[in-house]
UniProtKB/Swiss-Prot annotation:
GO (cellular component) term, any one: cytosol
InterPro entries from the UniProt entry: DUF520, UPF0234-like_C, UPF0234_N, YajQ-like_sf
Chaperone found in the keyword field: no
Family recorded in the similarity comment: Belongs to the YajQ family.
GO MF entries: nucleotide binding
Function: Nucleotide-binding protein.
Taxonomy, superkingdom: Bacteria
HAMAP family: YajQ
UniProtKB keywords: Nucleotide-binding
Source organism per UniProt: Prochlorococcus marinus (strain MIT 9515)
Pfam families: DUF520
Protein name, per record: Nucleotide-binding protein P9515_05441
């Protein structure tokens, strides 16, 4: 049994689910009594969500709705990185939410080191924004997946195990 088993570790999210969640947020903003007439604008660009509204209270309500809809769509809340609130013209406030996607080299190296320190019989290689974890034992790979769940909390990034072979 010289066959190696492997899986890939990625930090990703389903963009279409995010688009659907934000569409639901826009619909709820237009229908909720406390948010009607607040001139709230919600924009999604490649790696950012921009929220512009008339008060911080409304902004906090919109952020809560975004979180609720993201959870219902099975999106991790760790993909959202909240920037500071800015005052913009016309007595409005704006917040930028950056979307985290991909593993940078520094975090990939730390995760790789943690996995190798805990489980001696695995090989970990970094391929761009993906980690490939290989072992001759499926049990070691399952232990690595369990360890990834703990590392997700440590590094505050969403991690998924894909292509389990």
């Amino acid at each position: 049994m010289a066959e190696n088993f492997s899986f890939d570790v990625v930090s990703d999210f389903d963009r279409q689910e995010l688009v659907n969640a934000l569409d639901q947020v826009k619909r709820e903003i237009s229908q909720r009594y406390d948010l009607k007439g607040t001139e709230t604008i919600l924009e999604l660009e490649k790696e950012n969500i921009f929220i512009t509204t008339n008060s911080e209270l409304t902004l906090n309500s919109v952020i809560d709705i975004i979180r609720q809809k993201a959870i219902k769509r099975k999106l991790s809340l760790k993909i959202f990185e909240y920037k500071s609130i800015e005052a913009v013209s016309g007595n409005k406030v704006k917040q930028t939410i950056t979307l985290k996607k991909g593993l940078n080299q520094e975090i990939a190296k730390k995760i790789s080191k943690n996995l190798r320190d805990e489980i001696k019989k695995i090989n970990v290689s970094i391929n761009g924004e993906t980690l490939r974890v290989m072992s001759k034992s499926k049990n070691d790979l399952q232990l690595a997946i369990k360890l990834l769940e703990n590392l997700e909390e440590t590094y505050k990034i969403p991690l998924q195990a894909n292509n389990y072979r």
